[in-house]
Every structure is written in C-alpha cells, then in structure tokens.
C-alpha cells in the first residue's frame, strides 16, 4: 500500500521532516515487532482530534502498526539522538527503546510526532532490552490523559498494545508498546548533544528546524536565536506553574525530559501530591529531593541554563557577549514564573485583580496548609464550595484568621458570588489522577479488568466538573505507614 492509499484508509497524513536534519541527530531503524500482540487501549477521542479513522485503527490493521509489525509506507522510522543531565550528570542518551514512525499533519496544518515506545533495542539502547512493561505504559496513558483534561500541555497516548511477551524487570511482567503523540520530541538534551558532539552548522540546523516547527513567528527575525531562547523560557515558566497549581510532581526533571515545545513528557516516577508539603518526593531514586515539589521551578531554571549554554555560539560570535545575553534571558525566568504563579493562585482564590498584599494572602494559606498537613486539591475544592469538613486545618486559628482576610479581599473585587465561584471552579480541579486511584486501575488492568481504568479515564476528561458522579474520586487514600513510592518504569 502506498502512502496515498494508506492516508485514505487511516487518516494519517505522513511526513518525516526530522530526516532533513544532519544525520548525527538520528539513526534509521525498523521496530522489532510483536509475535502475539493485542490492542488493549485505543484513544478514540484523540484519534478524532487528529482526524484519524478510528474504525480502521481500532482493528487488526491498526494493531499491526501499534505493535511495530507494520511501518508507515514511504516513511523511514528513526531513533533520535540526544544527551541529558541526569540528576545533574551529563551523559549521552538517545531513544533506547523508542522509534519515531513519522509526523502526522492535521487538516489545520498542526504537526505531531507518532512514536512507538517499547518497540525494541536501538543503537542507543546501551544495556537496556528496548522493551516496556504493561503497567508503566498504562500509567503514562492514564496520567497524560489526566494532564490533558486538566488543561496542561502534554504528550498524549494514542494506543497501548500488549505484545504477548514477558519482560524481565524486578520480576517478569507483561510486555507492552505505547504509541505516543507529541508536538515533537526535541529536548533540551537534543541541543546539549548538538553543542557537545556536533558542529556549529549542526547546532544551527537544529535551531532553525525547531524555530520553523514551533516558533515560526520569529523565523525571519534578526535576533531569532535570542528570541528562541526567550520563547522557550516563557513556555517552561507557564508549564511549571500549571504543574504546581495542581500538585503534579514530575519526579525526573532531567534535561532530556524537558521538551522545547513546552509539553510535559515522560511520565516515569511522577505522581500527584495529596498532603501539601513543598518537600514532597515520590521517586525511589531521588534520595536528596532534587526534584521535590517545591524545587521544580529551580530545576526548570537549571535546565534552561543548560539550554542557554548550548545556544551560546548562536547568540553572539563573541563568547562574553553571548554569555551576557544568556544570563539576561535566563534571569527573566524567575520573574515570569512569579508573575504566572501569583496570577494562577489569585484565580484559584476567586480574585480577578491584582492587589499589593495578595502575595502575603496566598503564602499565608499555603503555610497554614503545610503546617496542618491539608490535602492540596481538596482544600481548594472546599474553598470553592465554601464547605469545610473533615480537615483539621479548617478549625485552626490560623485558618480562621486567614479566611477573614480572604473574605475582605473578595469584597474589594465587587464581583458576584457566582462570578467568584465560576472563576474558582475553572481553576480548582474537583478531581485529579490520585496515586491510589491510578494504582488500583493498573492492578486491575494487569489482571485483564479495565472497568475501573475506563471509568477513571472518563472522569478525568472533565476534572473541573463539580459533579456528584465524580465525588468518589475525591476521597483520600487510607492512611498508611508506608510512603507512596514511584519508579522509572516508563
């Protein structure tokens, strides 16, 4: 089947412009394939958004694509090369178990990578087997869809296939392949790789390609590389604020896990915070709390500093001048983050305007929440509904004092109760992908029962809907002596 007939049958409008880059950025390779695959999850709503033929792809025809048994006609699959600072240590990486099948271009000219994850060893696999386990792939599916529902830029999951094979981790697990959709997979680590092992022309080619793909409005600007740096800084500031506002903890913010597009990527040891504590860490390998909830803005800044270092030769031929430009641009991150953060927190508290003491009001609430170990999500739900139950924080003197200050501040807005509540409901999710719910979904799914997972996914499509039907997903996990721990399974 040629590309034209394939497009007509599936809806996939395929290209691979990444192949126009110098060949140090990729390695051509076909997926290994699966002997006895089964399509266990297909994202019909995403397929519809992308203009794909759901009926064809949610069949044996689609299964063969998602299982790595068939590739897109006329398109060469590639593994992408990149580096990364892993917990601060620079190393060569690359797609060790993923392949970019191609790029799908929608009818409104939006371009998306179509990537198989868990499709076998590549030239960049090092000691890995190139495979993926079922539970981590389903975990990425659930949480990425949850993030999308929350309105947070993210990669998406189109399909999950059970390969019919076992993979050895700490124990034997069911093998799987996830089909990931992303605006692109160009990472901070891709630029670090180009700066370290490529030529100046390689670096320039990558930057020009990325600008054309993600920031076409600056492509013809005289100072396009400086503007490029500033655009990426701005997108990351916006993204991290959105993470913080819902208690999302990525867990492994290495430079290979920060993409230039500003999407959330790689849902390995991520989790959502229940009890508000800025020191919260879930990852089993984050012993020092480098990627703790409260440190995520600092780590984003650190990653962006590495990005600016990679761009230095493009910012100015004179190194000293280039460093000064980079420093000036990077210094804006904290200002942008602070601005976006307090704007978001005002919205979460029903405030439409900016007043001098708002920062003290916001910080006063958060410090009280931390002191009394309040649930992050449900505290803001309680404030939204003006309904205070089951939390010791609400009976504290600190909260009562804060509440009076907040009410006085709301009066200054001259807005109706309905307007205030609508603003709060649109910024305070009623539900999130709570860790215990995700774990229950995965446990059942591994046994072949997808009922709870499907119901959870349906609920997460509308997390800002304060519906009675969603109330069961607001319940906190039972108290446990064992802390919740996540692993880098994805």
UniProtKB/Swiss-Prot annotation:
Active-site residue numbers: 256
UniProt cofactor(s): Mg(2+); Mn(2+)
Protein biosynthesis is among the record's keywords: no
Protein name listed in UniProt: Protein nucleotidyltransferase YdiU
Biological role stated in the UniProt entry: Nucleotidyltransferase involved in the post-translational modification of proteins. It can catalyze the addition of adenosine monophosphate (AMP) or uridine monophosphate (UMP) to a protein, resulting in modifications known as AMPylation and UMPylation.
Record-level Gene Ontology MF annotations: AMPylase activity; ATP binding; magnesium ion binding
Pfam families: SelO
Reaction equation(s) it catalyzes: L-seryl-[protein] + ATP = 3-O-(5'-adenylyl)-L-seryl-[protein] + diphosphate; L-threonyl-[protein] + ATP = 3-O-(5'-adenylyl)-L-threonyl-[protein] + diphosphate; L-tyrosyl-[protein] + ATP = O-(5'-adenylyl)-L-tyrosyl-[protein] + diphosphate; L-histidyl-[protein] + UTP = N(tele)-(5'-uridylyl)-L-histidyl-[protein] + diphosphate
Organism field: Clostridium perfringens (strain ATCC 13124 / DSM 756 / JCM 1290 / NCIMB 6125 / NCTC 8237 / Type A)
TM helices/strands, residue ranges: none
EC nos: 2.7.7.-, 2.7.7.108
NCBIfam families: PRK00029.1
Family named by the database record: Belongs to the SELO family.
Positions annotated to bind Mg(2+): 257, 266
Top enzyme category: transferase
Binding site for ATP: 94, 96-97, 117, 129-130, 180, 187, 266
Highest rank taxon of the organism: Bacteria
Keywords assigned by UniProt, alphabetized: ATP-binding, Magnesium, Manganese, Metal-binding, Nucleotide-binding, Nucleotidyltransferase, Transferase
């Amino acid at each position: 089947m040629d590309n034209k007939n394939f497009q007509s049958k599936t809806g996939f409008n395929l290209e691979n412009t990444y192949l126009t880059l110098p060949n140090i950025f990729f390695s051509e390779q076909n997926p290994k394939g699966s002997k006895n695959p089964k399509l266990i999850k297909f994202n019909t709503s995403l397929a519809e958004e992308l203009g794909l033929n759901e009926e064809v792809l949610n069949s044996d025809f689609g299964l063969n694509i998602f299982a790595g048994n068939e590739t897109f006609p006329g398109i060469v699959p590639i593994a992408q090369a990149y580096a990364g600072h892993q917990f601060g240590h620079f190393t060569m990486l690359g797609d060790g178990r993923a392949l970019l099948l191609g790029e799908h271009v929608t009818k409104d000219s939006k371009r998306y990578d179509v990537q198989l994850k868990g499709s076998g060893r590549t030239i960049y696999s090092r000691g890995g087997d190139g495979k993926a386990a079922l539970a981590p792939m389903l975990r990425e599916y659930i949480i990425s869809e949850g993030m999308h529902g929350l309105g947070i830029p993210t990669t998406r999951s189109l399909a999950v296939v059970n390969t019919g094979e076992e993979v050895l981790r700490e124990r034997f697990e069911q093998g799987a392949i996830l089909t990931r959709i992303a605006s692109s997979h160009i990472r901070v680590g891709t630029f670090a790789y180009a700066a370290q092992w490529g030529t100046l022309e390689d670096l320039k080619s990558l930057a020009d390609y990325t600008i054309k793909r993600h920031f076409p409005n600056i492509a013809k600007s005289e100072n396009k590389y400086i503007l490029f740096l500033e655009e990426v800084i701005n997108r990351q500031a916006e993204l991290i604020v959105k993470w913080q506002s819902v208690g999302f903890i990525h867990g492994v913010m290495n430079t290979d896990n920060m993409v230039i597009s500003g999407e959330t990527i790689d849902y390995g040891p991520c989790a959502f915070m229940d009890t508000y504590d800025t020191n919260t860490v879930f990852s089993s390998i984050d012993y020092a709390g480098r990627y703790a909830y409260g440190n995520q803005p600092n780590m984003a800044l650190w990653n962006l500093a590495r990005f600016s270092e990679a761009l230095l030769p493009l910012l100015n031929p004179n190194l000293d001048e280039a460093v000064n430009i980079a420093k000036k641009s990077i210094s804006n991150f904290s200002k942008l983050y602070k601005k976006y953060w307090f704007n978001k927190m005002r919205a979460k508290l029903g405030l439409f305007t900016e007043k001098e003491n708002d920062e003290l009001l916001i910080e006063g609430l958060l410090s009280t929440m931390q002191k009394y170990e309040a649930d992050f999500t449900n505290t803001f739900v309680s404030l939204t509904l003006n309904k205070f139950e089951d939390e010791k924080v609400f009976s504290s003197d600190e909260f009562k004092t804060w509440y009076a200050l907040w009410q006085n501040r709301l009066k200054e807005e001259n807005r109706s109760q309905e307007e205030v509540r609508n603003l709060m409901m649109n910024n305070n999710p009623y539900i999130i992908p709570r860790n215990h719910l995700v774990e229950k979904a995965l446990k059942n799914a591994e046994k072949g029962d997808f009922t709870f997972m499907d119901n959870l996914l349906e609920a997460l499509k509308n997390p800002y809907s304060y519906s009675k039907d969603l109330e069961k997903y607001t319940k906190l996990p039972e108290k446990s002596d064992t802390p919740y721990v996540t692993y880098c399974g994805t």
